């Protein structure tokens, strides 16, 4: 986590909420490159070797099976290039897409810049709508456009979601309107994403999200236990997400997601 250096008093005041805490990190690390490098370290320092039996490995294999379908594309809210690494391992041609604002020397904002690796019409399209920070060896190798693509702080999100015609917003609306989406590893708690889903919701939900039937519960003494949702809990959650166009697919716990995805892969002819 990039938050480990934040004094506990500040975290207590902020309630350890991600957006204002990220904003505080950016305020402390005033240098754009220093802040981006801290994010980079939090993403890649503990990275594990590629394993096709993991969630990302199965997603990459699913993409490999579907790469010939021009309607198949991937939207990621992650900043890392782990999925790209898996796709490269499987020889799947991938176009990583992101956007940022660049500033001219006279202080005027330019139009949106779209960064892409490869040609979107000739490869799988992977949309990084909250920014893209691929792995590099050293701090000095960080690319300015990648650094300025990151949407992480309170100010970043406020600016992004107050621009209804921006590329990230238009891309998400396009996905939600034109595709049947499967949400993997996404809690769907972000109010901005929920608002876009609600805007595009139809009479019958057409999207799907994988949720776990178990959850972590912490008591007053700080002890954590694993509990299971009751059938009533699950029904209430299903009804809640039905309103914004989401059907819930239940697994016993999140460790089952790779198995679920593997079975989906095997079912595709």
Q: Could you describe each region identified by the protein language model?
A:
Residues 1-5, 12-20, 30, 34-35, ...:
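SIR2/sirtuin-family catalytic core signature
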Residues 31-96, 100-101:
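Metabolite-binding pocket within alpha/beta catalytic cores that recognizes anionic/polar moieties
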Residues 44-52, 155-164, 226-227:
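Short, flexible loop segments at the rims of nucleotide/cofactor-binding pockets, characterized by
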Residues 77, 102-104, 202-203, 241:
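Glycine/proline-rich loop-helix segments at beta-alpha junctions forming the active-site rim
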Residues 79, 128-132, 213-216:
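Short loop/turn segments at strand-loop or loop-helix junctions that form parts
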Residues 84-89, 137-148, 192-197:
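A short secondary-structure junction signal
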Residues 93-176:
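Active-site gating loop/helix substructures
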